[in-house]
From Swiss-Prot:
HAMAP family (UniProt xref): Bpt
One of the Pfam families matching this protein, by short name: ATE_N
Lineage: Bacteria, Pseudomonadati, Pseudomonadota, Alphaproteobacteria, Sphingomonadales
EC numbers for this chain: 2.3.2.29
Organism expressing this protein natively: Novosphingobium aromaticivorans (strain ATCC 700278 / DSM 12444 / CCUG 56034 / CIP 105152 / NBRC 16084 / F199)
The protein's name in its UniProt record: Aspartate/glutamate leucyltransferase
Length: 284
């Protein structure tokens, strides 16, 4: 006898200050990922704009705002810009390894340095090593950590300069959280390189998309995501391709925003997250 299908229960968080747009509040809807069908549910929810944080899938559900837009890169048609080509060339000697979703002290130390520069005073800045382990290891779906290390002459394990917690979905790779050395002496653009590597990796695996999370028009520090072309965004009628002129205009605004921001705070300085979302919620 076939077991009955269990539909997920969804909850909504209480309003909280928006981390992207000053003066606004945010609210999220979320559900728990668990059991034998967690991967299947995560795939289905990912296609309608949900993101994963540990055992929770969530998406914005703000009352008076729809600024957070889910975006994904079309891997088979991706064409890097001249700047992206230079960044890739500068960092292509890095040793890239796919590791099990298991935290290490070396990863945590790199995360702390990253947060100290990119998110000083942010919600994640107070994370301890146990919190980091929970973030990486508490996953009910197919996940891994991709590490980026400098090469060594003798073939020994080199210095860790970047890492990304990544989910493998049925139609692509979902970049859950990436971090890197924000003050490396010679390697600028590490955040961009990690995205480029994911695009190449997905294309080689026959996966059509790389999910980058939410692009927030009006949030200067989120504009870096729109620089990868071609890109699709999730709207009321489903996924649709950015019009070339529309994306070119968004990229121009991103370049302008970059010139106005301190260098240490531009690339990837705000991340999608549902930190503490389970603390205050109502069933819907």
């Amino acid at each position: 006898m076939t077991a009955p299908v269990r539909f997920p229960r969804f909850f909504v968080t209480s309003p909280a200050p928006c981390p992207y747009l000053p003066g606004r509040s945010e609210r999220k809807v979320f559900t728990e990922l668990k059991g034998a069908n967690a991967d299947e549910l995560n795939d289905a929810l990912g296609r309608i704009g949900f993101r994963r944080s540990q055992t929770v899938a969530y998406r914005p559900s703000c009352i008076d705002c729809q600024a957070c837009v889910s975006v994904r890169v079309v891997t088979g048609e991706f064409r890097p810009s001249s700047t992206q080509k230079r960044i890739h060339k500068r960092n292509r000697d890095l040793e890239v390894s796919i590791c099990k979703a298991w935290s290490t002290p070396e990863q945590f130390e790199l995360l702390q340095r990253y947060l100290a520069v990119r998110h000083p005073g942010g919600g994640m800045a107070a994370m301890d090593e146990m919190d980091f382990a929970d973030m990486v290891e508490h996953t009910p779906v197919k996940s891994y950590v991709i590490e980026y290390r400098e090469p060594t002459v003798d073939g020994s394990q080199g210095r860790l300069v970047g890492a990304c917690l990544t989910d493998e979905q049925g139609d692509g790779l979902s970049m859950i959280y990436s971090f890197y050395d924000p003050q490396h002496e010679t390697r600028s653009g590490l955040g961009t390189f990690i995205i480029l590597d994911h695009i190449q990796r997905a294309a080689r695996a026959g996966l059509p998309y790389v999910y980058l999370g939410y692009w927030v028009e009006g949030s200067e520090r989120m504009q870096y995501k729109v620089r990868f072309r071609p890109m699709e965004k999730l709207g009321r009628d489903g996924w649709e391709r950015f019009e070339p002129a529309e994306q070119a205009s968004a990229i121009e605004r991103a370049v302008t925003a970059r010139k106005c921001e301190p260098a240490s705070l531009v690339e990837g300085s705000l991340k999608d997250g549902v930190h503490g979302a389970q603390e205050r919620y109502a069933h819907i």
